[in-house]
């Protein structure tokens, strides 16, 4: 079960979190997750943190975050790189370890500083005999470009949008909804209980009050002139971290901890490389089937807004009423620090369910390379 869920605000590229390395953000989230429920660092038995952009991060980023949060050196750790699904996979692994009886209490989540991703010069080690060298942006190379077809995620999104018949107009309307819902949630204080401030930053930097359908519809497609994916209906490039404390039922009872949510089922799937828009729904359907549930049994759904097209297609495949999806906005507005987004959608959904009487919640996310993960929880 999950007894704590905390995240940092999500900062824009070069914004309010630019001076923090991913591991520092991870430490802040871990420390806050423990403090929220009165757990001591020495009680934690293991740490699993997702991080995608590990170039230049140093050895064992999850261990860095763990030690930085004040956990004992005896606490082991794993760093997960499953692209956008990294942090939700971390929670799945924690759940599996606890069910196997290996541990009773694990911190799981993710962290990313896309602002601090370095550039690389591949042939610099042995020098260039002749000609020019090219700097490689490790943010786009390791995080945003498909290894298999060499296309940027935006190019894949536009291609699949055409293949699946997802109109540009629908994508822009969903993007507008994402910003509007996120602003409403911020104004209503809905994110306060899940966010730990970092320095002077206490709210997500991405949501725009001044956006409109007219503005979004005038943006030019990115990469593909005939495409439908724009800077407006895609998420930003962001920094942030999130951490959840996952425990056994016996540990929570013994320590007198109130569970925020129970993990009911998990699922993970793989598909053709470009078809990210299908994998959240496929994973979600599998998780529901494992639990013997139907989508109509679910009160809230969080589908990571890797692009508006991903949410639109996955919601259609799941057969879910869009009004139950991303009710407080999503990554198009809030941001998508790739290694931390799974932790964010899971935590946001938990608190939303608690405000509305509980029930089942489904969190699903796609990831580069054509994979997808889903967690079904109950509050």
Predicted segments with their positions:
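Active-site pocket-lining segment
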Residues: 155-158, 191-194, 201, 264-333
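Conserved catalytic cysteine-centered active-site region
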Residues: 20, 51-105, 147-153, 210-236, ...
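Flexible glycine-/small-residue-enriched beta->alpha junction loops
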Residues: 99, 105-159
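Condensing-enzyme catalytic core mediating Claisen C-C bond formation in acyl metabolism
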Residues: 1-20, 135, 214-278, 282-285, ...
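Conserved active-site "lid/cap" helical segment
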Residues: 1-52, 56-57, 61-65, 69, ...
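Active-site-proximal alpha-helical scaffold in enzymes
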Residues: 80-112, 161-190, 243-250, 315, ...
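N-terminal extracellular/periplasmic Venus flytrap/periplasmic-binding protein-like
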Residues: 7-8, 19-20, 25-28, 36, ...
């Amino acid at each position: 079960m999950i007894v704590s869920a905390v995240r940092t605000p999500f900062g824009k590229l070069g914004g309010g979190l630019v001076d923090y390395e991913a591991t520092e953000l991870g430490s802040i989230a871990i420390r806050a997750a423990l403090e929220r429920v009165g757990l001591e660092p020495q009680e934690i038995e293991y740490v699993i943190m997702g991080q995608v952009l590990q170039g230049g991060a140093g050895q064992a980023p999850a261990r860095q975050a763990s030690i930085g949060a004040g956990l004992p050196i005896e606490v082991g750790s794993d760093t997960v790189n499953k692209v956008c699904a990294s942090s939700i996979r971390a929670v799945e692994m924690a759940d599996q370890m606890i069910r196997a009886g290996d541990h009773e209490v694990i911190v799981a989540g993710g962290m990313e500083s896309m602002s601090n991703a370095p550039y690389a010069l591949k042939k610099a080690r042995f020098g260039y005999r002749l000609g020019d060298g090219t700097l490689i942006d490790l943010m786009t190379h390791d995080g945003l470009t498909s290894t298999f077809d060499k296309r940027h995620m935006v190019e894949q999104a536009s291609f699949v949008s055409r293949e699946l018949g997802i109109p540009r107009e629908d994508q822009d309307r969903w993007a507008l909804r994402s910003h509007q819902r996120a602003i409403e949630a911020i104004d209503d204080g809905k994110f306060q209980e899940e966010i730990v401030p970092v320095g002077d930053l206490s709210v997500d930097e991405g949501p725009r009050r001044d956006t409109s359908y007219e503005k979004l519809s005038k943006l030019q497609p990115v990469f593909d002139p005939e495409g439908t994916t724009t800077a407006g209906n895609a998420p930003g490039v962001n920094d942030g971290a999130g951490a959840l404390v996952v425990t056994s039922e016996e540990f929570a009872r013994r320590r007198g901890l109130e569970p925020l949510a129970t993990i009911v089922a998990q699922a993970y799937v793989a598909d053709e490389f470009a078809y990210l828009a299908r994998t959240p729904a496929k994973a979600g359907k599998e998780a529901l089937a494992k639990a013997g549930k139907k989508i109509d049994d679910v009160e809230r759904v969080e589908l990571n807004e890797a692009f508006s097209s991903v949410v639109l297609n996955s919601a259609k495949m799941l057969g879910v009423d869009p009004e139950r999806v991303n009710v407080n906005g999503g990554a198009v507005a809030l941001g998508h620090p790739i290694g931390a987004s799974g932790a964010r959608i899971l935590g946001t959904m938990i608190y939303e369910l608690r405000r509305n009487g509980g029930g089942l919640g489904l969190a699903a996310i796609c990831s580069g390379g054509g994979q997808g993960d889903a967690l079904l929880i109950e509050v």
